[in-house]
Regions:
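Conserved glycine-rich cofactor-binding loop
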Residues: 16, 23-24
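Conserved glycine-rich Rossmann-like NAD(P)H-binding loop of the short-chain dehydrogenase/reductase
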Residues: 37-52
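Substrate-binding pocket helix/loop in short-chain dehydrogenase/reductase
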Residues: 105-106, 110-118, 216, 220
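Active-site loop-to-helix junction immediately N-terminal to the catalytic Tyr of the SDR YXXXK motif
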Residues: 109, 156-164, 176, 204
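Active-site helix of classical SDR
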Residues: 129, 166, 174
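Alpha-helical segment proximal to the catalytic Tyr-Lys
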Residues: 134, 179-183
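Residue(s) in the substrate-gating loop at a strand-loop-helix junction
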Residues: 149
Length: 228
């Protein structure tokens, strides 16, 4: 596939960003774009692969460090913020990307399935925002980007009750938090992407009717414009 060459214009020169769920998929795509635009990024995810991804970006001349973090744990999020402040001194951007999606029939599902989605998709965003926002408030500046889903805002498929519920919650969370943070010159925005070529989507694509026939380009978008 032909790859377009995109030119960086340094939109984020000197900015310090935390990206959760940064080891793969949309989070990794955001990390590539942010660092290409000059940001220094702290990549957070649960597994060691986030450390390897940080090494990959460093090898390409980007400013990136990895940190293992479980966003469902409030203390882990505080540790992430402490690490960022110790490493870079401040936080300008917070990208809340970490999330899970597993399919299950609502009537036969157990509470563990529901609670897992709530723990990562809702509490995870809540925890990392609670940990990072005090720094932005002190700075009287900042930007929070929350990755929800079209599933939580427009349309959902069978088996996605837990996922759709938690992603819809993020839309309401964003609206309310944006109003609270506006007096501190902090922007809070929510993005609701559709299907993207990520490991998460590929894992459950086989259990759904294909969506690509309904798309103008007959293919799923890539998580990073450099891959398009």
């Amino acid at each position: 596939m032909h790859q377009r060459e995109l030119v960086s214009i340094g939109k984020l020169d000197g900015k310090i960003a935390i990206i959760t769920g940064a080891s793969k998929g949309i989070g990794a795509g955001i990390a590539r774009v942010f660092t290409e635009e000059g940001a220094c990024v702290v990549l957070a995810a649960r597994g060691n692969d986030v450390l390897q991804f940080a090494d990959e970006l460093q090898a390409a001349g980007r400013e990136a460090v990895g940190f293992r973090c479980n966003v469902s744990d409030a203390q882990s999020c505080k540790n992430l913020v402490d690490f960022t402040l110790k490493t870079y001194g401040t936080i300008d951007i917070l990208d809340c990307n970490a999330g899970i999606c597993t399919l299950s029939d609502f009537l036969t599902s157990d509470d563990a399935w529901r609670d897992a989605h709530i723990g990562i998709n809702i509490k995870g965003v809540w925890n990392v925002c609670r940990a990072a926002l005090p720094t932005m408030v002190r700075n009287n500046a900042g930007s929070v980007v929350i990755i929800s889903s079209v599933t939580g805002d427009m349309v959902a498929d069978p088996g996605e009750v837990a996922y759709a519920t938690t992603k819809a919650a993020l839309v309401g969370f964003t609206k309310a938090l944006a109003r609270e943070m506006a007096p501190h010159s902090i922007r809070v925005n929510c993005i609701c992407p559709g299907d993207v070529q990520t490991p998460l989507v590929k894992a459950w694509q086989a259990n759904r009717a294909p969506t690509t026939p309904h798309m103008p380009f007959r293919r799923l978008p890539m998580p990073c414009p450099w891959d398009a």
